[in-house]
């Protein structure tokens, strides 16, 4: 049936034709209803939830923050097949975690380790790195162990050893961070002039966190966030195609991720690493069923644009 038209008279005598019925963009609610109808047509029903009290995704040797980060780092690229072109990207990716992954790892027990985390940050054993606001990770931060942090600074000192001014700046910054490990710094605490701070920001060592507050970052942090964005997007798209946007754990682990890697020529994190991230970031819920642990895309995960 043709669309109905409405003719409006303007002051200058011109006419304007409005369509009373036009094709509108579907809302998330409409998409959800259509998805449910499609699932009903296949004869499938939602998974039967037994409990939201689920066992940990990763078994920890001990439940210290340091050990938790070490175990998560071990899972970063476990059981992931990638093309040769992505190996360089993986090699350059700093070994760190998203802070919210600890929520996905400990879940209801996270509050018991949060105080230990803050203490480790104050002593400098763990560094909190802030993600750039231009990335799609608003308010998120990463955690890196002191040995990995020092190793990366050593790499950049070697890289700029022939550029005296830059080398001196990086050396002074690293020394300051060792002697005074804080989550963020004022311009007075940094002891750099404006030109030096601006250079460190442009190189990726600092980010402006507030009016007079600077957070610590790293130049190759963008590689980590790039792979993280790919991993979140891949998991979200996979669950969106599933009936009721949910999947049993065993089916998820058996998925051949190498197919996606070959098509997109991109790197992805390992399944347990990305699931801890997705749960901690509120993109996915986990629950127990008669068939074992399962995961379901949340409203936040459905609406998030990567």
UniProtKB/Swiss-Prot annotation:
GO terms for biological process: meiotic cell cycle; positive regulation of Ras protein signal transduction; transcription-coupled nucleotide-excision repair. It comes from the Eukaryota. Its EC number is 2.7.11.1. It catalyses: L-seryl-[protein] + ATP = O-phospho-L-seryl-[protein] + ADP + H(+); L-threonyl-[protein] + ATP = O-phospho-L-threonyl-[protein] + ADP + H(+). Pfam families: Stk19 (PF10494). Keywords: ATP-binding, Kinase, Meiosis, Nucleotide-binding, Serine/threonine-protein kinase, Transferase. InterPro entries: STK19-like. One of its GO terms (molecular function) is protein serine/threonine kinase activity. One of its GO terms (cellular component) is nucleus. Belongs to the STK19 family. Serine/threonine-protein kinase. Has a role in meiosis. PANTHER family: SERINE/THREONINE-PROTEIN KINASE 19 (PTHR15243), SERINE_THREONINE-PROTEIN KINASE 19 (PTHR15243:SF0). This is Serine/threonine-protein kinase mug51.
